[in-house]
Amino acid sequence: MYFGHIAIYTEHLTAMTDFYCRYFGGTVFYEGVYGDQKSVYIAFDQDCYLELMDKASVGPSPLSPGEERQGLTHIAINAESTARVNELTARLEKDGYPVVWQPTDYGTDRFYESCVLDPDGNRVEICVHEKVLRAERGLG
């Protein structure tokens, strides 16, 4: 089994679409209108996709941008290397996106990641998969 898609309601459909396509290599493969809801589907390298939805009857979140809470707390996107995590984090920061934490090494072969906020204030972790990290460090 694997995740099919993640769906996010947004008041900033264009900005969110641009963010996930420009910085994470997504490609819009479908746009539709269903009553008062507009949806944009963004495909990535694997079978998982992101559905962004703008619906007038869904109000804004009462949470502050980046605020942690029970329930879904972040999206993690795997980068191909630690260098890519560093480069993308620096680019996002330069372009004005809030960085929750800079690239951080959580141990020799476990985690290397940063965290930024998307235009809606959702946390997005930019990670290196454990297998890639181990290979970069010659740990097999």
Q: Which positions does each model-derived feature cover?
A:
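Vicinal oxygen chelate
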Residues: 89-140
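Short, flexible active-site-adjacent loop segments at beta-strand->alpha-helix junctions, enriched
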Residues: 7, 56, 81, 120, ...
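N-terminal beta-strand motif that seeds the catalytic metal site of vicinal oxygen chelate
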Residues: 1-17, 72-77, 130-140
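Exposed loop/turn and edge beta-strand positions of beta-sandwich/beta-sheet ligand-binding modules
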Residues: 36, 71, 110
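Core segments of cupin and vicinal oxygen chelate
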Residues: 8-50, 54-57
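Mid-chain, well-packed structural core segment of small domains
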Residues: 77-89
